[in-house]
Every structure is written in structure tokens, then in C-alpha cells.
């Protein structure tokens, strides 16, 4: 069964893309940097360990493993530091992924404390006292809706748990036959993105993007192997001997104005993580739109702001790079 998904999809894929493998429209466009920011004010420098960035309602938010949680304005000037490392009010320990809702409330997963914390634009709100006992996919995007957290989980029959007050109230999105391997739990990690009237479930190591309704119905599915520049990347995961490891192809994911953006890796020669894939859901399917290559080789996270700019965190240079994206339809 391990090879069924890849073998079947590779056969179908080779037939379906053989005529377009050299299509110029499938090749990534090289982007130029418009701005670079590596420090805030006179004394706060960004570290190389930034797991998440988001832009919402004119502000930008970042988590830094070394320093905590920051709120910035649209020009990337510091508004406030919203957390403390160590004991005390607003404590965080290895702040990881987070989600900002329409009311500027930030739900942050405290990886070291194994619980969620909540922040407003410029202050700490409260910490969830209940540790989450689920086996969470800690490196994945999640979202909140109606007071509940939608989070990817590992090792069960379902890919998504809905969590309130530390308790699982609902499980959704069954594992996919022929795609998920019970012997490789790590491969079941998924990014979750809230869309318009649906949400997206995106594999980190498996080439699958799914759209679901909020009542758990699958609406559409896309196989990332259909994108020629990712075909050989996913082939490496098929050949892994370890039963609990994988190559992380989709490092980060983001949803903005009807488009799904994926930060993807490649392993040909020197490791790189600098290509943005753009997808769009139409009535009943998900389609490839375009791809962009960022200037440097290694990026940990990114987001898209209201000005259609990509804010990408460069791990090597410990900086936020700003790119103006071409308009897509």
C-alpha cells in the first residue's frame, strides 16, 4: 500500500502533464526584493528562528523562538512586544504557530508549555490552563472559528481536531486511503487554512491539498505532483526507509483573497526553501495558478498583506523581506 498512491498518481500525472511539462506558464517567476528589515527600533534584532508571521488589519505579527511575540505596523515598525520568556505574566516558551482573528485576538501555541495563549494587538490576554493532550502537529498552521481551534493532529483516524478549553469537541477529515501511511505518523501532518466558506487541509510531506466544508464534507482535492517542479521532490518521500520521518515539502501555507499560497522546498543538490506556489479553488476543483522564486535560499515562514506584498522571513539573514507580487486572476 505504501507505493500505491505514488505509483498510481505518477502514472496518471505523466499522462496528464506530458504535454505541458515545458509550458512557460508553469515555470516560477523570479521576484525582486523591495525592502528588508532585520531589527525593530534601535535594539531589537530578529533571530534566525521565526516560526510564524501574519498580516491582519494593517498590522504584522511574528513569533520568535528566542524573544517571544511582536506586533508591528504595516511599515514593520515595532508596536509592542506582547510576551515574556520565562516566568511571569504573558509567559511563553518556544512560541510557535499562531492565528489572528478579525478582532485582532491572537491565538498562539506555546510549544514548550503545550498549551495555547491569547493576546490582543498590544497586550497579553490570558493563557489556557488546560494542556492539550492531543498529539498536535506543532509546526503546522491552524485557525480559530466560533471560539474553537481547528488543529492538525497525528496518529489517529482523523486529520483535524476541533478544540475548546483544552478538550476535543469534534474530529474531522478522515485520513486518505492510499495517501496516508499508518506506519509513518509524521507524514500525516497538515497545515489548516481558513478560507471563504470552507477550509483547506494541506500536507507537509504528502502531495495533497483538500478543501472541506465546516461540517466536514470534502469539496475539492488537488495533487501537487501535477506541478512539474514538485514531481521529483515528492518522489524522495516515496523512497524513505525510516517509518517516522519525511521531507517537508510545504514548509508554510497562507490564504489570502481566494488564493492558496504554499512555501515549498526542493532537494536537488543544495537544499532550498524559496518557491511560492499559488493555487485557487473554483467551483468544485483546485487549480494551479502560478509560482514565484524568492531571492535567497532559505525561508521559514511568510504571509501576504492587504497590499498584495509577500512578507517572507529569511532564516539565513535573520530578516523580513518584502516582495510585491504580480496580480493574479
Summary of predicted features, one role per range:
Residues 70, 114-117, 156-161, 206-210, ...:
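Structural motif
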Residues 47-52, 92-98, 135-145, 187-191, ...:
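Repeated scaffold domains used in trafficking and secretory/extracellular systems
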Residues 241-279:
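Loop/turn-rich, solvent-exposed surfaces of beta-rich toroidal or solenoidal domains
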Residues 62-66, 107-112, 151-156, 201-204, ...:
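Conserved beta-strand positions in repeat-built beta-propeller and related beta-rich domains
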Residues 57-58, 103-104, 146-147, 196-198, ...:
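Short coil/turn segments that connect the beta-strands within blades of beta-propeller domains
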Residues 39-67, 261-266:
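Beta-strand-rich domains and repeat architectures in extracellular enzymes and scaffolds
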Residues 78-102:
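Blade-loop segments of beta-propeller domains
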Residues 32-42, 82-90, 130-134, 169-185, ...:
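Surface-exposed loop and turn segments in beta-propeller and other repeat-based domains
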Amino acid at each position: 500500500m505504501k507505493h500505491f498512491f505514488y505509483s498510481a498518481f505518477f502514472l496518471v500525472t505523466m499522462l496528464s502533464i506530458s504535454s505541458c511539462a515545458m509550458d512557460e506558464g508553469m515555470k516560477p517567476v523570479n521576484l525582486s526584493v523591495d525592502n528588508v528589515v532585520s531589527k525593530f527600533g534601535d535594539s531589537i534584532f530578529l533571530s534566525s528562528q521565526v516560526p510564524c508571521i501574519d498580516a491582519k488589519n494593517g498590522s504584522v505579527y511574528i513569533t520568535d523562538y528566542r524573544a517571544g511575540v511582536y506586533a508591528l505596523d504595516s511599515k514593520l515598525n515595532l508596536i509592542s512586544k506582547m510576551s515574556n520568556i520565562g516566568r511571569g505574566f504573558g509567559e511563553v516558551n518556544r512560541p510557535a504557530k499562531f492565528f489572528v482573528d478579525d478582532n485582532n485576538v491572537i491565538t498562539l501555541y506555546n510549544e514548550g508549555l503545550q498549551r495555547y495563549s491569547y493576546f490582543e494587538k498590544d497586550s497579553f490576554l490570558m493563557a489556557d490552563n488546560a494542556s492539550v493532550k492531543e498529539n498536535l502537529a506543532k509546526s503546522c498552521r491552524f485557525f480559530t472559528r466560533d471560539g474553537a481551534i481547528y488543529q492538525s493532529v497525528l496518529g489517529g483516524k482523523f486529520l483535524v481536531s476541533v478544540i475548546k478549553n483544552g478538550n476535543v469537541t469534534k474530529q474531522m477529515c478522515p485520513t486518505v486511503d492510499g495517501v496516508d501511511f499508518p506506519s509513518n505518523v509524521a507524514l500525516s501532518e497538515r497545515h489548516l487554512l481558513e478560507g471563504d466558506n470552507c477550509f483547506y487541509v494541506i500536507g507537509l510531506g504528502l502531495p495533497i491539498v483538500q478543501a472541506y466544508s465546516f461540517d466536514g464534507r470534502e469539496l475539492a482535492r488537488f495533487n501537487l505532483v501535477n506541478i512539474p517542479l514538485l514531481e521529483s521532490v515528492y518522489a524522495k518521500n516515496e523512497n524513505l526507509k525510516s517509518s517516522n520521518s519525511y521531507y517537508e515539502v510545504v514548509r508554510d501555507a497562507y490564504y489570502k483573497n481566494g488564493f492558496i499560497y504554499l512555501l515549498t522546498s526542493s532537494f536537488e543538490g543544495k537544499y532550498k526553501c524559496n518557491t511560492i506556489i499559488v493555487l485557487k479553488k473554483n467551483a468544485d476543483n483546485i487549480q494551479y495558478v502560478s509560482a514565484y522564486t524568492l531571492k535567497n535560499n532559505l525561508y521559514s515562514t511568510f504571509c501576504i498583506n492587504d497590499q498584495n506584498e509577500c512578507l517572507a522571513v529569511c532564516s539565513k539573514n535573520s530578516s523580513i523581506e518584502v516582495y510585491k507580487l504580480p496580480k493574479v486572476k
